[in-house]
Structures are given as structure tokens and as C-alpha cells.
């Protein structure tokens, strides 16, 4: 099965268009005000309106108030929600949308148990753990910690770069990979050459 690709932390229309030209399946928009990659609803709408059909738009939230999240949904056509905080399964499912739950791979994380708890999730996104940081750490975790034949679709994140992505896909065989900082020039601004190299790395294994 082909591993899908999501470029996250998109803040500019031109980066979104470049991602799609390179063959990305999805883009991620960050609605977490504390992130250097955060976008306003107006920015997000201007990006999304330029996208061609069949591109998945993912909205990333961290412990967002339901009224704030609903305001975003009212203004921006988002296909999938991505939760990066301590949201419960009930909170994730409240909006009646497909959702991804991010799991930070701290010591002792019980993935089979979390898969049961978040049974309604479309996938679990596995990211590196850093205390006090909900994501975008630029660090990788030990991919051997992912159980073989895991019951949920896995989206691999955390410290992925053009240099290690082929190895990551070959070893984990994830449903999808999610990259942000590994293909940036500066935080929030993507590097077209790095994006292209990342896609080549995925395609070399696919």
C-alpha cells in the first residue's frame, strides 16, 4: 500500500500549491495560537480556496475550546480534525467529523490501550515526546516501539526529514507520514527543494 504524505504547518498559499504539485495527499493548518506556524481563519480560507479537488485539508487543534473550534469549522472547509492535546475520545468525536488523535510517545505509552480508547479515530498520529510541547519538536522517537500489526492506521511524525524518510517508511510501513519542520526554511515557511527531496524519499520506497 502506498504511504500517503501530509505537509503540516502550511502558512502560505504558495507552499500549499507546491505541496500538491509534488504529489502530497494532504496539508495541515495549525489553529493553535502559541505555535509559530499558526494561521488565522482568514489565512486558512485563502489557502484552502486555492486547492484543487481531492486534496485533504487537516485542521490541527490543541485543547481548543469547543466554541473556538466551531468558529473555525464555520469559516474554513476542513476535512479532518487533528487533536494534539489531552482531548478525550468524547471531545474528539463531538463535532461529527473524521479525526486523527496525536499520541506523544512518552515512556510507558500503551498504544494498544489507546487504540481501544480512540476506536472512533480515523488514525493515530505518533509523535516524539517533549515535556510541555504538544508537537513540532523536530525530534524522532524509536520507531521500534510501534507494535507490529498494530490495529489502527498509523501516521508517523516527529523528526522526519528528507534524509531519514525512506528508512522510516521502510521500517514502519505507516499509512501516512506527517512532516513540518523537516522541510522548512524557517518556521512556517517551507523549502521547495526539501519538500521535493522528501517526496522522492517516500516514493523510493513506495
UniProtKB/Swiss-Prot annotation:
InterPro entries: Aldolase_TIM (IPR013785), PRAI_dom (IPR001240), RibuloseP-bd_barrel (IPR011060), TrpF_fam (IPR044643)
Pathway, per record: Amino-acid biosynthesis; L-tryptophan biosynthesis; L-tryptophan from chorismate: step 3/5
EC numbers for this chain: 5.3.1.24
One of the GO biological process terms: L-tryptophan biosynthetic process
Coiled-coil stretches noted in the UniProt entry, renumbered to this chain: none
Reactions the enzyme catalyzes: N-(5-phospho-beta-D-ribosyl)anthranilate = 1-(2-carboxyphenylamino)-1-deoxy-D-ribulose 5-phosphate
Top EC class of this enzyme: isomerase
Key words, A-Z: Amino-acid biosynthesis, Aromatic amino acid biosynthesis, Isomerase, Tryptophan biosynthesis
Superkingdom: Bacteria
Any Pfam family matching the protein: PRAI
Gene3D superfamilies in the record: Aldolase class I
Gene Ontology molecular-function annotations: phosphoribosylanthranilate isomerase activity
Record-stated family: Belongs to the TrpF family.
Name the record gives this protein: N-(5'-phosphoribosyl)anthranilate isomerase
Organism annotation: Nitrosococcus oceani (strain ATCC 19707 / BCRC 17464 / JCM 30415 / NCIMB 11848 / C-107)
Biological classification of the source: Bacteria, Pseudomonadati, Pseudomonadota, Gammaproteobacteria, Chromatiales
Amino acid at each position: 500500500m502506498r504511504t500517503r504524505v501530509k505537509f503540516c504547518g502550511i502558512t502560505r498559499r504558495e507552499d500549499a500549491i507546491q505541496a500538491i504539485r509534488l504529489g502530497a495527499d494532504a496539508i495541515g493548518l495549525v489553529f493553535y495560537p502559541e505555535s509559530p506556524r499558526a494561521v488565522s481563519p482568514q489565512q486558512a480560507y485563502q489557502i484552502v480556496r486555492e486547492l484543487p479537488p481531492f486534496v485533504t485539508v487537516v485542521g490541527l487543534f490543541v485543547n481548543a475550546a469547543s466554541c473556538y473550534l466551531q468558529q473555525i469549522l464555520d469559516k474554513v472547509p476542513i476535512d479532518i480534525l487533528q487533536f494534539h492535546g489531552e482531548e478525550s475520545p468524547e471531545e474528539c468525536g463531538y463535532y461529527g467529523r473524521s479525526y486523527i488523535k496525536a499520541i506523544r510517545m512518552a515512556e510507558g505509552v500503551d498504544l494498544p490501550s489507546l487504540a481501544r480508547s480512540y476506536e472512533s479515530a480515523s488514525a493515530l498520529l505518533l509523535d516524539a515526546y517533549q515535556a510541555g510541547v504538544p508537537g513540532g519538536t523536530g525530534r524522532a522517537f524509536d520507531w521500534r516501539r510501534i507494535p507490529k500489526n498494530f490495529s489502527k492506521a498509523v501516521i508517523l511524525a516527529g523528526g522526519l526529514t528528507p534524509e531519514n524518510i525512506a528508512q522510516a517508511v521502510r521500517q514502519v510501513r505507516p499509512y501516512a507520514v506527517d512532516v513540518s519542520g523537516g522541510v522548512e526554511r524557517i518556521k512556517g515557511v517551507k523549502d521547495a527543494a526539501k519538500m521535493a527531496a522528501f517526496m522522492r524519499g517516500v516514493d523510493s520506497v513506495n
